[in-house]
């Protein structure tokens, strides 16, 4: 089997419009200058777009993944991949990983291509990807997460999650350390000792605040403290990890870079790794195995590719991971999002868990007529 074509398809949904992007805004009430993000309410509404990569073979098997790849990046992949066998997945990974510097691209740039190869290999074998890798669990528990809010807002979100059977919640908060402590205490008191709580202050703490808050989180039995400071400060994360017993998780803004992410774990600057299959399934699995040998976890960021399908597979294949990160308001939120582009079977949250389909490859089922009707560019 040989690769014959690599296509970058840009789809546009004329029935859905958005402003997209973020603006930078200052956090009020802090002595230091601290920023966060918000939307762009004055920006013109535009039709929503999404790109997909397709890898075609001479046996008629096609791998598909959503992507943020540029036409130039797709052309690099096309130049090197056409004529190669998709069974050379590891060799192609090594070539693009080691060659990243020489084509002047950011780390992880070819992740969608890697995902397409896994899709092809599963379809050729007649097996779901979870069977190719080796399944360790039939389904993965989810935690619900959302935006910055107040005590009532967090408790309301937790109740929404409970209605879906979800037993864990992750805060996002940009208020600064001292403002967060009474919120964490109040929510823990409200939900009781057995509900799982996690927090992600999104770089809104300094080191002193992170240590102070971290000790409170230990008292309140939180699962982990995520990205409390800007991740470029490795020495501060090393000090934080030494000071706390709660798991500290950095590397969300570094997770596209397999080498930097590995070094953070090796150098004791994080207790858990962050990963996202947007940067490739092979990369995620390599990081998971590295973490496993260090007695650490990898936690997957958001849905990955194909509206949760890819992370549903990987979460059921990786022993050292705890949760699927879910942002939805209803149990079928992922399915609704996928349906916009013709994906019919994005996973549901059922009894607080997510599970992959049993079809070959990623098991994605498509309304091909709808998918094709939305294509506005092909590269």
How would you label these PLM feature ranges?
Residues 1-59, 334-335, 340:
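Structured beta-strand/loop patches that form or line metal/cofactor-binding pockets in enzymes
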Residues 3, 60, 113, 126, ...:
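Conserved, mostly hydrophobic/aromatic
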Residues 32, 90, 215, 221, ...:
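Shared catalytic-loop signature of beta/alpha-barrel
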Residues 56-124:
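Metal- or metallocofactor-binding catalytic centers and their adjacent structured scaffolds
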Residues 58-64, 124-127, 132, 290, ...:
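Ligand-binding pocket scaffold of soluble enzyme catalytic domains
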Residues 65, 142-146, 169-171, 197-201, ...:
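Hydrophobic faces of well-ordered beta-strands that scaffold small-molecule active sites
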Residues 131-239, 243-244:
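Metal-dependent enolase-superfamily TIM-barrel catalytic cores that perform enediolate-based chemistry
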Residues 360-379:
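Extended hydrophobic packing segments that form well-structured cores
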